[in-house]
């Protein structure tokens, strides 16, 4: 909301799709700027996190058996689930001035959650920021690496966002890598514990075998891949 001598301007309506780290940051930033913020995530468990940073969690009833994996990340869903999600999100998107897309599935292309028809129903001059553009985008109108006009809306598809803040990105990357390596060291030597959740998620091959489920699954989709388990 903006108050001026000429009157009061109503706040912008912001809808955030995906409530991971980027989504929660987008919610809190938009709230600090005075926007009315709503958000949705296929994982109902994040509702409290959305509300804790000032967003309103949008209830969208979906028949999803397993919305998240053991690490808390969203799982890939069948196309019928995404189709139903688009149908139920259409009204919320149509009422929004800004939509920020952050929905990603580890190891998979970004799910398509906003169709061109949904963009066309948004108010003229609306803005869509698709943070999933590098993985294909959550919005059908997104062009990775470009800002385009679609159905009267501006669609921004940034890629390699870390390069826009190289100093801070380098600091965070170095800190995370050093913390990860120290986690693997025990008494001055590298120690790989197969029961450790971090090791399970990051270990790709061991003793000539592909042990990471995501890599095995990705290999199965490539002709001549190593789905059988042997590493190249």
Question: What positions do the PLM features span?
Answer:
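Glycine-rich phosphate/diphosphate-binding loop of Rossmann-like nucleotide-binding domains
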Residues: 1-92
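Adenosine-phosphate binding glycine-rich loop
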Residues: 2, 11, 139-230
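Structural motif
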Residues: 13-15, 35-38, 55-57, 97-99, ...
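Short, solvent-exposed amphipathic alpha-helical segments in soluble enzyme
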Residues: 31-33, 53-56, 114-121, 143-147, ...
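Catalytic cores of large soluble enzymes that bind and process phosphate-bearing ligands
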Residues: 42, 77, 81, 88, ...
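Short, ordered loop/turn segments at secondary-structure junctions
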Residues: 42-44, 62-63, 104-105, 132-136, ...
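ADP-ribose/adenylate-binding Rossmann-like module
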Residues: 98-156
């Amino acid at each position: 909301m903006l108050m001026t001598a000429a009157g009061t301007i109503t706040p912008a309506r912001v809808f955030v799709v995906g409530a991971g780290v980027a989504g929660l940051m987008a919610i809190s930033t938009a709230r600090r700027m005075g926007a009315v913020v709503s958000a949705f995530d296929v994982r109902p468990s994040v509702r409290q996190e959305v509300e804790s940073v000032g967003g309103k969690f949008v209830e969208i009833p979906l028949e999803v058996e397993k919305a998240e994996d053991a690490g808390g990340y969203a799982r890939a869903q069948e196309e019928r689930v995404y189709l139903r999600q688009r149908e139920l999100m259409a009204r919320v998107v149509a009422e929004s001035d800004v939509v920020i897309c952050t929905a990603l599935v580890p190891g998979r292309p970004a799910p398509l959650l906003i169709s061109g028809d949904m963009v066309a129903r948004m108010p003229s001059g609306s803005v869509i920021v698709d943070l999933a553009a590098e993985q294909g985008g959550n919005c059908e109108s997104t062009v990775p690496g470009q800002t385009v006009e679609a159905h009267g809306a501006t669609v921004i598809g940034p890629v390699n966002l870390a390069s826009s803040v190289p100093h801070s990105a380098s600091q965070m990357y170095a800190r995370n890598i050093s913390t990860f390596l120290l986690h693997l060291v025990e008494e001055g030597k590298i120690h790989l514990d197969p029961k450790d959740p971090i090791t399970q998620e990051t270990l790709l091959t061991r003793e000539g075998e592909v042990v990471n489920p995501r890599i095995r699954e990705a290999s199965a989709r490539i002709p001549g891949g190593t789905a059988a388990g042997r590493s190249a």
